[in-house]
Amino acid sequence: MRSNVHQGHVARKRFGQNFLVDDTIIHGIVNAISPQADDVLVEIGPGLGALTDPLLERIPQMQVVELDRDLVERLRRRYGERLQVHAGDALAFDFDKLAVPGRPLRIVGNLPYNISSPLLFHLMDFADHVRDQHFMLQKEVVERMVAEPGSKAFGRLSIMLQVRYYMEHVLDVPPGAFNPPPKVDSAVVRMIPWPRHSDGRLRSPHADCDITVLGDVVTAAFSQRRKVLRNTLSFLRDQVDFDAMGFDLGRRAEEVPVGEYVELARRLGGTPSGRAGQAA
């Protein structure tokens, strides 16, 4: 049997399909998720059910979003009423419609690596209705997500996600845990949205800001990583007094803490507004 065939299904490159087959890894992920009977659990890209099976051993029902039409029919036949299958592209899916008052969503998935960053930004739009997210991603992406200022991995993805989520690198996953095996190492990340105060402000280590303005600032700052910020952000001098706010333009973009980028965005953009997807 060819290496890209698993349980009679041919993995499709255009969908970024790599099926998880290692039972030890699978149960490690499920234990990290720790599903409870009353959870509103949503899986993105369930594939052949590697995570779906053990999750449904612990909870009575769940929902999935699957793009591959062949797998949609297969999942419906296999799980029946215990699994509500939403056929469609997660990048365009409205996760708000799955929210239940008082029961925020728990979203999980082995995400296609070719769309992981756009999907993470898309999901930011629904963070107010999410309790947590557990995703399998390319290890390099997870390292960028949780990176600290001053490291080579620290960049736009780190800043934009850390403003909205507490994140934790949960476990590493080798290529051999998949069929077909990807060419890169993988990892699982836990993402917990920062809650809000009663007035709508985020209870984040960083001040709230206009996410669209922050995205523009960070994109400009990292447009020339090897140069200091005097070369990339000096065009903003007419709008903000960098010296007065103690923002040193002699640093490189990766040396600036998240909070300083947020404060710069606040001074440029005023009150928080905008959708996360606009910052992508």
UniProtKB/Swiss-Prot annotation:
Q: What is this protein called?
A: Ribosomal RNA small subunit methyltransferase A
- What keywords appear on the UniProt entry? Cytoplasm, Methyltransferase, RNA-binding, rRNA processing, S-adenosyl-L-methionine, Transferase
Organism of origin is Cupriavidus necator (strain ATCC 17699 / DSM 428 / KCTC 22496 / NCIMB 10442 / H16 / Stanier 337)
Q: List the disulfide bonds.
A: none
Annotated compartments: Cytoplasm
Q: What is the uppermost EC class here?
A: transferase
Is Lyase set as a keyword in this record?
A: no
Give the enzyme's EC designation: 2.1.1.182
S-adenosyl-L-methionine as UniProt keyword:
yes
Its lineage opens with: Bacteria, Pseudomonadati, Pseudomonadota, Betaproteobacteria, Burkholderiales
Gene designation per UniProt: rsmA
